[in-house]
Swiss-Prot record:
Could be involved in insertion of integral membrane proteins into the membrane. Transmembrane segments: none annotated. Keywords: Cell inner membrane, Cell membrane, Membrane. InterPro entries: Membr_insert_effic_factor_YidD (IPR002696). It is a peripheral membrane protein. Belongs to the UPF0161 family. The keyword Zinc does not apply. This is Putative membrane protein insertion efficiency factor. PANTHER family: MEMBRANE PROTEIN INSERTION EFFICIENCY FACTOR-RELATED. Its main location: membrane.
Length: 69
């Protein structure tokens, strides 16, 4: 299940993200964070961490360096 989710994020990175303007306020980007979280913590916890990260990626959050715990 985790590998399938990583493939979906990679698809987004390769085919969808290049046509959108850059908007991630964090380093690593939210999609790269999602891949790292899925690989490190598995499908359930990794998805939860990625979901929380995407919610933090907004104009009211300062952003910056935010590695996977």
């Amino acid at each position: 299940m985790g590998r399938l989710l990583v493939l979906l994020v990679r698809f987004y990175q390769l085919f969808i993200s290049p046509v959108l303007p850059p908007s991630c306020r964090h380093s690593p980007t939210c999609s790269q964070y999602a891949i790292e979280a899925l690989q490190k913590h598995g499908a359930i916890k990794g998805s939860w961490l990625a979901f929380r990260r995407v919610l933090r990626c907004n104009p009211w959050h300062p952003g910056g360096y935010d590695p996977v715990p």
